[in-house]
């Protein structure tokens, strides 16, 4: 239940600050920056300017934070009905819808100008494009209409890879495109296991995530397909000359363990295992570890060639 503006004004200042920070979803942004900074090392083939790294990270944080705030503004009706999102600032009344909207728009404008004036305008437009894609295409159009929402909506989360490259080179190349595709094929098998866990929440609010409209067997099969394509694409960097033995070894080992987990989930789904024994969150947690390991290898590889 939303509180009145007068009661919001009585909230401690520190709690209000924490609420606005929560609107940006810092933990998700950490994952986005994990993919941005290593690509800067790859583009530089060494250590990029510390100033450039800091400005790119700040711009990326503000842009993604603005997108997340606008997402919460649009989804405030269903967030109030889902257990997983019931403590978000708009639901608890710590922040009003008007404040959230103004905050999100402000971050979008500031991040675009920061990128354009201190990094380059290619990065600025990519950043703005990611924000608009997430807010308009995913949140407003796809999320409540199709079970493929996270597949195409996930494009927004892939663009930080391109931004990392463009911030250093002010251009594009095949290397960031390949890593963009890695993230594109990573997103569904990353998010679907979580959706399997909380599918009742999504069903309650009418969001047709794939696990809501399809059986666990179907979802697990899709996870395996996307996983194989993701691992295969991740290995394209080396034959094209962008990475060497270290990245290749890490990609093979990390990818192999991912496939082991994905097939394990599929086998449990085929056996019609349900509840905690399905262990779908094992793959979700590993997916975060996988992308962290893979992109650390992207950053380290130039120093070992």
Swiss-Prot record:
The keyword Nucleotide-binding does not apply. Disulfide bonds: none annotated. GO terms for biological process: heme O biosynthetic process. Gene3D superfamilies: UbiA prenyltransferase (1.10.357.140). Signal peptide: none annotated. It is a multi-pass membrane protein. This is Protoheme IX farnesyltransferase. It comes from Streptomyces avermitilis (strain ATCC 31267 / DSM 46492 / JCM 5070 / NBRC 14893 / NCIMB 12804 / NRRL 8165 / MA-4680).
């Amino acid at each position: 239940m939303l509180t009145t503006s007068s009661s919001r004004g009585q909230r401690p200042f520190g709690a209000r600050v924490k609420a606005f920070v929560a609107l940006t979803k810092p933990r998700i942004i950490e994952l986005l920056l994990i993919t941005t900074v290593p690509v800067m090392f790859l583009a530089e083939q060494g250590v990029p300017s510390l100033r450039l790294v800091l400005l790119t990270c700040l711009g990326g944080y503000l842009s993604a934070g603005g997108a997340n705030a606008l997402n919460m503004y649009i989804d405030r009706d269903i967030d109030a009905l889902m257990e997983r999102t019931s403590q978000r600032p708009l639901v608890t009344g710590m922040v009003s819808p008007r404040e959230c909207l103004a905050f999100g728009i402000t971050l979008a404008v500031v991040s675009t100008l920061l990128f354009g004036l201190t990094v380059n305008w290619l990065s600025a437009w990519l950043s703005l494009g990611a924000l608009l894609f997430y807010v308009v295409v995913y949140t407003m159009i796809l999320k409540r209409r199709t079970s493929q929402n996270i597949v195409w909506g996930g494009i927004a989360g892939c663009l930080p890879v391109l931004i990392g490259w463009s911030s250093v080179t002010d251009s594009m190349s095949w290397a960031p495109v390949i890593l963009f595709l890695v993230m594109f094929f990573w997103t569904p098998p990353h998010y679907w296991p979580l959706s399997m866990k909380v599918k009742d929440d999504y069903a309650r609010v009418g969001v047709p995530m794939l696990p809501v409209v399809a059986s666990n067997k179907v979802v697990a099969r899709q996870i395996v397909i996307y996983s194989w394509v993701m691992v295969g694409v991740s290995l394209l960097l080396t034959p094209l000359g962008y990475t060497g033995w270290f990245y290749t070894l890490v990609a093979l080992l990390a990818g192999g363990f991912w496939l082991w987990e994905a097939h394990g989930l599929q086998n449990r789904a085929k056996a019609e295992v349900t509840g905690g024994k399905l262990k779908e969150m094992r793959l979700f947690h590993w997916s975060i570890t996988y992308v962290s390991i893979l992109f650390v290898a992207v950053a380290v590889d130039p120093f070992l060639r």
